[in-house]
Design a protein with these regions (language model features):
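Short catalytic/metal-binding and nucleic-acid-binding patches
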Residues: 1-183
Length: 183
């Protein structure tokens, strides 16, 4: 079955990239991931509005200059990260048998799930809800008790910019995102 992505000009896109078999690879290789994004920014024009890196998946909101390029942006990040992690630590790659089975059954291989989730954001309220969801994600998954304690997200930049109070994330703050579940 072919998958067709929707491209709405001048929009933001919430993207979730997951590792193959949800292996914990991103935090251990955070500098390689940062480099992958920097390398991709040399070839494509986009802004990362919000991001949260978890051990097995990444949430980000992109604002690409050309909305039709967000798939290429993600492909470039995945390629750069896979290449560099493979150079540093090839044991992150699956065995050849796992690759054959994964590719045959789900057309997946390497470090990432083949597809990524994407949702086009159409208004400011929705953008704010998605930003909140992304920043609350480490608490949702039980990695920390307070949003401010997770250092692998853009939350701290949002605090600096006065979007959030540094103690944001209590039950009243997250009321609007309770029904959002993108995973």
């Amino acid at each position: 079955m072919n998958y067709h992505r929707v491209y709405i000009p001048n929009s933001f896109v919430h993207i979730i990239i997951a590792s193959y078999e949800r292996k914990h690879i991103f935090i251990d290789n955070i500098e390689i991931l940062r480099t992958a994004f920097k390398n991709t920014m040399q070839n494509y024009k986009f802004e990362i509005v919000a991001i949260c890196v978890l051990p097995d998946h990444i949430h980000l909101i992109l604002n690409p200059e050309n909305i039709k390029e967000y798939s290429k942006i993600i492909s470039s990040v995945k390629h750069s990260f896979s290449h560099d992690v493979g150079q540093v630590c090839p044991t992150y790659f699956c065995s050849q048998d796992d690759l054959k089975i994964g590719y045959k059954n789900k057309r997946e291989k390497g470090l990432f799930q083949r597809r990524f989730y994407e949702h086009t954001i159409v208004n400011q309220e929705e953008l704010n809800n998605h930003i909140n969801y992304i920043h609350y994600n480490p608490v949702k998954h039980g990695y920390v008790k307070c949003v401010k304690d997770w250092k692998y997200s853009s939350f701290h930049k949002f605090v600096e910019d006065k979007f959030y109070d540094k103690n944001w994330g209590n039950p009243n703050d997250i009321e609007n995102i309770k029904n959002l579940d993108f995973e």
